[in-house]
Amino acid sequence: MDPLGAPSQFVDVDALPSWGDSCRDELNSSDTTAIVNTSNESLTDKNPVSESIFMLAGPDLKEDLQKLKGCRTGEAKLTKGFNLAARFIIHTVGPKYKSRYRTAAESSLYSCYRNVLQLAKEQSMSSVGFCVINSAKRGYPLEDATHIALRTVRRFLEIHGETIEKVVFAVSDLEEATYQKLLPLYFPRSLKEENRSLPYLPADIGNAEGEPVVPERQIRISEKPGAPEDNQEEEDEGLGVDLSFIGSHAFARMEGDIDKQRKLILQGQLSEAALQKQHQRNYNRWLCQARSEDLSDIASLKALYQTGVDNCGRTVMVVVGRNIPVTLIDMDKALLYFIHVMDHIAVKEYVLVYFHTLTSEYNHLDSDFLKKLYDVVDVKYKRNLKAVYFVHPTFRSKVSTWFFTTFSVSGLKDKIHHVDSLHQLFSAISPEQIDFPPFVLEYDARENGPYYTSYPPSPDL
């Protein structure tokens, strides 16, 4: 019987050393089929592991990552290893740790390790090299995270050990002591190591797959509903769950009938005032989050900024399409940044100038995001938006805009003006009132010739 309680016929202790091992070598030089990269949701995190992988893998890795369109916390995604010794790189995103959300962080970190191993199994990989997924700047306590990492790997190998021959944990000098202390607990090489490790055994060792268990969230379901349970007391004792927790938490309390409320909305029976109040509450939640969130990474893109005023004295806001790497950023954070910047602008009349100039498929905002933005923002955004100047459109963008404004947000249709050249734009907004990205001026000069200080008014605007 080893410290995790696995019967000897289920786990061969003599085989365990080949399953788990730790090393202080660079992860990139690990002789494994795949190595693990810990990153953020846009897969652009700058940490020692990621930077080393990007440097050695070469520029092709960045191109491959753009196709993934990010990675959510707890997920795992696969790319080639390119110039690395490993054939593959498995990318995952560890959770940010806050003590009051400890359970959620534990579950997310478990998912990281579990999904990496599951992906390795599906791709028939014989070995995996793990970095420490819980990066220091995300604040996860090292020892707690190490328990989850080793336990999850151990439980996975108990079930699927025949498919994965070796797992390597590549650790730094700071992490090595913790891993050396806890590795014998989950991968004991002798009975002596087993006994020496017992004091480090945590109270919660998870379920059969290593997943963290929250007792009060366990719900018992009878094997044979409707059938009399003769051994009710015996089974309750064996279950080991305190049923007194059930019903005592917020998620178990009675709430209003949400489906009924939605049905009333669909039937038009909910008053206009109630709908507006509900929408305002939702917008205020987004606004509060926008004011408290760190959005510096989105701001640094310089994709949205205020410039001068148009010929009618209305504020001009500029959106630079080429500066929006849709596949590499968290689009919810982009929405938060839009609200953060625009909330005080939208209290009075304004216009938007969108530069579609030299955008690629990686810069195009999809209709679902635009519809979400339109639905979330306050009514003042729509009421005070007087025009959207769509500069340097393509045929495809014109068709997409027509479909979107016809079938999704018809209220915008009459406000959209396609502007093929800056000559046309200057009939509505003076050149001195707009801060142009240099590439926009260069493109327009190349396509439409240099501009001058006076222009005939365009009938389109």
UniProtKB/Swiss-Prot annotation:
User: Which residues are in coiled coils?
Assistant: none
Q: Where is the CRAL-TRIO domain?
A: 297-445
**Is Transferase one of the keywords UniProt gives this record?**
no
Q: Which Pfam families match?
A: CRAL_TRIO_2 (PF13716), Macro (PF01661)
Q: Which residues carry this modification: Phosphoserine?
A: S244
Macro domain: which residues?
1-187
For this UniProt record, the keywords arranged alphabetically read as follows: Phosphoprotein
Q: Does the keyword Phosphoprotein apply?
A: yes
Q: Which family does it belong to?
A: Belongs to the GDAP2 family.
Protein's UniProt name: Ganglioside-induced differentiation-associated protein 2
Name the species this protein comes from: Macaca fascicularis (Crab-eating macaque)
